[in-house]
Amino acid sequence: MDQIQVRQIHQVLLGCGFRYTNARDISPDSALRLLYSAAGFYVKSYLTSAGTFDVALVLKDEPFTTLPAAIILQSPEQLKGRLLPHINMGWYLCYVEEKEATWDPNDLEGLLRSVDIQIGLTLNNSVNAVETGLAVDAEMEGEFSSYWLARHTAYLVADVTQQKELNCFVAGTKNAHKTEYQEWVVCDDTTLEERDAWLSQRNLELHDSRGIITRRIRIKPSQLSGVTWPPKTFRAVLDWLAEVDNVAWLHLLEHFIQHPVKRHMILMDVLHQDMIGFRVDLDLGALALSSYQSSSVRRQRKAGRVNYAHLASAVSSKQAVQKFQRVNVVQADRLSVLSRNRRGKESGDLSTKHIALIGCGTIGGYLAGLLLRAGAGCGDKTFYLFDHDEFQPINFGRHVLATTDIGRNKAEALVSTLNSSTHLAKNIKAFTSRFAINAEQLKRYDIVIDATGRPPVSARLASVVRTFKLTERPVLIHGFNDGNGRASKVIIDDGRCCYGCLFANEAFYKDGMDLRFSHISMSAERHISCGSTFTPYDAAVSIITAGIMQEAALSVLEKNARWTYSEHMLEGGRTQKQKLLAAHPRCGICHGNL
């Protein structure tokens, strides 16, 4: 910031009621002093119904595009140590979602005044949520886990909602010379393969092959804000559960009766919040968990009821608890990872389909990664890639592969990249030969994706699938760059139309050429030599084509088709809207003339 801007900010903040405070007049033990080294800060007292909050602004080097941080120096005595919406760690005030917010960066005075108003509103909303308990803390939704302040992270490679027996494994860095790093992975018996892939790709190894028994507890809290948080002991966790959800409290205690072992990982699935967890190690010698009988045994033998209050006191006593650690929980299971970016999650992902990708050139290279991220090859169904060509230095400018792949078969290099990119990859395989276009081969797949850009291949695929019954056909998806890189075009052949139907429409095509490009000398732009043809254009059009082809593959999962033809024009005309392409009466493929 220059001096003019500094003076402008000074005058605006003083006008808003802030006072400039030297750093030496602020406690050196405060988070503000420990984290920020400025000579002074602007501080303002905000009055709420619960009392006064003193808030300091930390101005950034670029005040026009970056909002100042708001640090709470003092809060009302009755709220200290309490969980408050929008206040993290007891001192960091999240008064706006900066990444989602928009403002006029050229009006600095208006921006600072808006920040002042927003801080006041946020503090009042936070206090109001504590005092009234609004709708189980609507102000807290999505924030709760950030106040957990854990030192460790557990990654869930299993879908913990499936009620399977879970185990948590502790892993660390393989290189002994590196700073020791520890990571926890939760899986079940069906996801051990994903666990091993996770560890391998993150260069980790198990510290102990014995897992920590893990249990998910669902919590529907009566309130969140206003409680003492975060809990520093296991007893504090039990006290909190007893206060906000007695049923969850009982389920947790039953877990210890059913599993009288030393080490436990508990995942707390709080309604409308991200999951959090904790690890607790118990001294079994100080307890008598085996003397308690599970609820099912008690029903059968008609034994006396358990004194849960006594059990809670015993299991959380200082003598019983050897270790208590708060843990962040991150979902890394297939369902969570693959469905996150889909609007219609109910239709599933591509892991439920056998898929063949023919052609691993520029379009196929980008498309392969997109299909993987949509689930292809991540389940029991296969994702096979076909290409007979090798990756060469001249391919680098438009291809997703790297210099280390030069000389390798494109399909093999792509499969290596896909398998090493995620722990979810399971059934991905490369074939270094051309795809055999025959009935036996095509019947193996649910979706066959043609990324060759070669009309004879596309036309032959469309013809051969029409020898099948409609219910037995794979869906064909053709994608290609047209107009020497000026357009992306994608066709979905689900039986309504075919590749040939597009070019049979004489209103738009003549001799296989889009009439929008009729004024261009296509051959003059191509470099042709014996056995090869190269057309110079950048990778942008291929990336767009790959993106539309991914959309086409995902649309196959939907009950009702929205389109069978889509295009994007980069140059030479207007882009047509997506449409359901009808079978053309002059199409030789559909009418058996080929």
Go through the PLM ranges and name each one.
Residues 126, 145-324, 451-594:
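Glycine-rich phosphate/adenylate-binding loop
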Residues 28-96, 108:
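Compact alpha/beta protein-protein interaction domains typified by the UBC
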Residues 77-137:
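Glycine-centered motif in EGF-like
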